[in-house]
Amino acid sequence: MHGKVSIQTVRKTIRQDPNTRKEIIVCPGGAYATLSAFEGEPVARFFAGQGWNTSVCEYGVEEKARMPGPLLQLALAVAQARRENDFVAVCGFSAGANLAALLCTRYEEAARLLGTKPEAVRPDAAVLGYGVYRFPAGMVPQPAEKFGQVSGQSDLLPKCFRPALRQTAQGDRLDFEALMLEYAAGRQDPSADEWRSLSPAELAGPETPPAFLWTTREDTMVPSEQSLFYAQALWAQGVPAALHLFSRGDHGEGLAEQNPESHFWPEMAHSWLLALIGTES
C-alpha cells in the first residue's frame, strides 16, 4: 500500500551500540529479482568491525520490487536508524546501489509518502558499488559482448533471472540493466518518465548526499560508465563524490576479498566516511 503508507519493516540489525551513534545500512544487489547474500551481512559485519552500527535492508524483490515499494522500505530503515544514530549512511551494490541512490535523490518524495520529515529519511552519505544510475543507457540495442555471458548455464539460473536472457551468437547472456528496470517499473515497457524516475543520475540536486562510488572496468553486467554518470551528476551539482574505477574484477564482487586490486575498497570507503563525518562535525 502507498499513500500515507503502511510499509513492512525490513531493517535487519547486525550491530547496534547506543554509544556509537553512526550506522551503515547495507542494500544487497540481485537485479531487483533476488537479494545477494554475500552483498548483505558480510558487508555489514565488515563495517561493524570498524566500529559502525550496521543493518541490512531486505527490500522487496520480483513482484514486490515495483517502486516506490523498495524506496519506502529503505526510507523507513533510515528513519529507524536516525532515531538511534547521528550519522546514517546507505551502502548498496548493483540494484541495491540503484535503490540507495534513488533514496538519496527522492528522499523528499519518500518522506511525503511516509508522512514524515525529509531530514528523517535523507541519508547522510552513500557508498555505491557497480550500480545502475541511468536506465536509458541500458534500453538501446547493445553489442552482444556488453552482456554478462552465462556460458551455457542458463538452465541453472534462478527463474527470476531468466527474463533477462538474450540469445546471441556467443551464447546466452544476461541484460541486467533491462531486468532491473522491468522489475522496478513493474512492466516491460516503462515510459520515458518512468525511466527518469528510476535513474538517479537524472535526479541529482544540490541537496543530494555525498557518494563514494566504485566499480571495475571488466564488469560485463553493468558498464563502468554507469558509475561515472552518477559521479558527474553529483559534481555538476557541487556535491562531493569520490569515484574509484578498478581495472580488474567481475560484477557482484561484494567485499572483493579475492580481487588483489579492488579488495581495498571497504577500507577506502570507511576512511572516506570518517573524513566526511569530520567535515560535518
Give the residues covered by each predicted segment.
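Alpha/beta-hydrolase superfamily serine-hydrolase fold, recognizing
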Residues: M1-S281
